[in-house]
Amino acid sequence: MVVEPKILNNICITAHPLGCAKEVENHINYVKSQPKVKSNVKNALILGASGGYGLASRIAIAYGLGAKTMSVSFEKGATARRTATPGWYNNEAFSAFAKKDGIEDKNLILDAFLNASKEEVIKEAKTFFNGEKIDLLIYSLAAPVRMDESTGTLYRSSLKPIGKKYNGIGVDFLTEELLEVSIDPANEDDIKSTVKVMGGEDWKLWTDALLNADLLAENAINVAYSYIGPEMTKAVYREGTIGKAKDHLEATAHELDKEMQEKIKGHAYVSVNKAVVTRSSAVIPTVPLYIGILFKVMKNKGLHEGCIEQMYRLLNEKLYNGGEVPVDSDNRIRLDDWELREDVQKEVLDSWNKLTKDNLKEIADLALFRKDYMNMHGFDEEGIDYSQDVQI
């Protein structure tokens, strides 16, 4: 069929297989163009590896470190009437490129929150890694719901402010119209549910399961991802329900770091990454507008990075730099260091404060935001004829 972007409420519900493959190839080519990262990492497990920072992690690990990668993701294949999810095509594309380049990989389509999935991954890992242990574990799940198997309760994450109603400005990144944004405050159930889905509980369950199965190598590194952001997004992000979940994730990192040091001389870290376009960030009120302004400022300063540049830098400058892993006072790796640089944030804030509907296009690079968003779904890629039928 001919596949075109179909967007409802700023959510793209179609994906183009050839375009997704092209985007994966672009990321692979970026890593190939960089120096190899010196490390002893041979085996990596990436939980949530089909898009965004998880996919970029996998590509950087496979092509930057030359490691075997096992991926866990919860994606859907195509049906007669609809395309597969972007992550499904990303997984397929990565495997095809890896095979061509002689890099071993395995994709598992599982709900990572389930105990049965953890058991399945442990069983598969023992075979796939040929009895060797995992040197690097990446936890990059971004799911809206999680089932608590012990109670049968289904928890849903929400993006809400805490304490008072949020009123602010946002943008429709497709039409480039400024919007007034209003979000009612969270109740206790909203907070609890969001922490349950997006906090550190499941990360700890995975780490403990792998340690108990004796699958984590001596000196193994374990990384989960977080975000802090600027003052202007704090009410709806870092000081809201999502922020409570990130606080829990970061507290869990301290616990896991201690446990891994004691058991395998390993380490667990949270890496605080920069704001990028993801399927999630595109629907967070205020965030697309902030990202559009940030992109403009960082591009002008030669500091702009997407997911793949960030993940290569994580490996090359932070985790495997030949010395100590640089962390802040809370033991977090800071890949948002360029985003939160004083000169960058000052320019972003100045632009934010003088924003009007008339100067929006000058101040915010929404064209780049839109391109990144479309690329994630396999659209707007160079060299692809979107008028042609494609096998979905």
From Swiss-Prot:
Lineage of the organism: Bacteria, Pseudomonadati, Spirochaetota, Spirochaetia, Brachyspirales
Description of how the protein assembles with itself and partners: Monomer.
The organism's place on the tree of life at top rank: Bacteria
Organism: Brachyspira hyodysenteriae (strain ATCC 49526 / WA1)
Binding residue positions for NAD(+): F74, E75, D111, A112, L141, A142, K246, V276, V277, T278
UniProt keywords, alphabetically: Fatty acid biosynthesis, Fatty acid metabolism, Lipid biosynthesis, Lipid metabolism, NAD, Oxidoreductase
Reactions listed under catalytic activity: a 2,3-saturated acyl-CoA + NAD(+) = a (2E)-enoyl-CoA + NADH + H(+)
Name under which the protein is recorded: Trans-2-enoyl-CoA reductase [NADH]
InterPro entries the UniProt entry points to: Eno_Rdtase_FAD-bd_dom (IPR024906), Enoyl-CoA_Rdtase_cat_dom (IPR024910), FabV-like_NADH_b (IPR050048), Trans-2-enoyl-CoA_reductase (IPR010758)
Function: Involved in the fatty acid synthesis (FAS II). Catalyzes the reduction of a carbon-carbon double bond in an enoyl moiety that is covalently linked to a coenzyme A (CoA).
Record PANTHER family: ENOYL-[ACYL-CARRIER-PROTEIN] REDUCTASE [NADH]
The EC number(s) this enzyme carries: 1.3.1.44
Residues annotated as catalytic: Y237
Binding site for substrate: Y227
Single Gene Ontology BP annotation: fatty acid biosynthetic process
Gene Ontology MF: a single term: NAD binding
Enzyme class: oxidoreductase
Record-marked site positions (Plays an important role in discriminating NADH against NADPH): E75
Family under the similarity heading: Belongs to the TER reductase family.
Pathway terms, separated by semicolons: Lipid metabolism; fatty acid biosynthesis
